[in-house]
Design a protein with these regions (language model features):
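N-proximal low-complexity "stem/linker" segments adjacent to membrane-targeting elements
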Residues: 1-20
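A structural signal for isolated positions on well-ordered beta-strands in alpha/beta enzyme cores
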Residues: 5-7, 32-34, 50
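Short beta-strand/turn micro-motifs composed of small residues
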Residues: 8-10, 35-37, 103
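A short acidic (Asp/Glu
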Residues: 18-19, 44-46, 111-116
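Short, acidic, metal-binding catalytic loop of nucleotide-sugar glycosyltransferases
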Residues: 22-32
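Active-site-proximal specificity loops/subdomain of glycosyltransferases
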Residues: 38-95
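GT-A fold catalytic core of metal-dependent nucleotide-sugar glycosyltransferases
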Residues: 83-128
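Conserved catalytic core of nucleotide-sugar-dependent glycosyltransferases
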Residues: 109-165
Length: 165
């Protein structure tokens, strides 16, 4: 299977159901998970879940270094608007992966390989359009796709500089 890393930022206390999420990650050993969180409690992380403890302010500052304009990222929920840019924003962590994606921590996964097949991974650059589970091919072109104009000049700039979601 192609190498996949799911990016999961979560700031605040992780929900009580998080252990179930971790169990479902463990049942998918071919997928890695990158958890960015300020919750430093010792939890039963499987080998394929890589927890990076950091503050929301530190993540915001890191994202800001990638742009020449000031970002509006005042609360963690706004990170949802940045999801299509994770390939660009976290390129060091995602180096070596064929695909990266994002998902919600309230998801319980079955065998992802049954649904996301090698054939799909070889044919598509993006799988899933909803925030609860999306995959993107890890290439420079796809990782910068969020900057492509869609009827207005630099729509990402408007989204990244307003507090609205």
């Amino acid at each position: 299977m192609k190498k996949i890393c799911m990016v999961v930022p979560y700031f605040g206390k992780l929900p009580q159901s998080f252990n179930f999420f971790l169990l479902s990650c463990a049942y998918n050993p071919d997928v890695d998970w990158l958890l960015l969180t300020d919750d430093d409690r010792p939890l039963p992380y499987p080998e394929n879940v890589h927890c990076v403890v950091m503050s929301f302010d530190a993540l915001r500052a890191r994202f800001q270094t990638k742009f020449s304009f000031p970002l509006s990222l005042e609360r963690p929920y706004k990170l949802r608007d940045y999801r299509p840019a994770y390939g660009f924003l976290l390129e060091e962590e995602l180096r070596g992966y064929d695909f990266w994606g994002c998902c919600d921590v309230d998801m319980m996964f079955g065998d992802i390989g049954v649904f996301i097949t090698e054939d799909m991974l070889s044919r598509y650059d993006q799988i899933g359009r909803m925030g609860h589970f999306s995959l993107y091919r890890n290439t420079p072109e796809i990782n910068l796709l969020f900057t492509a104009a869609a009827g207005e000049e630099e729509p990402y700039r408007r989204i990244f500089t307003t507090e609205e979601n």
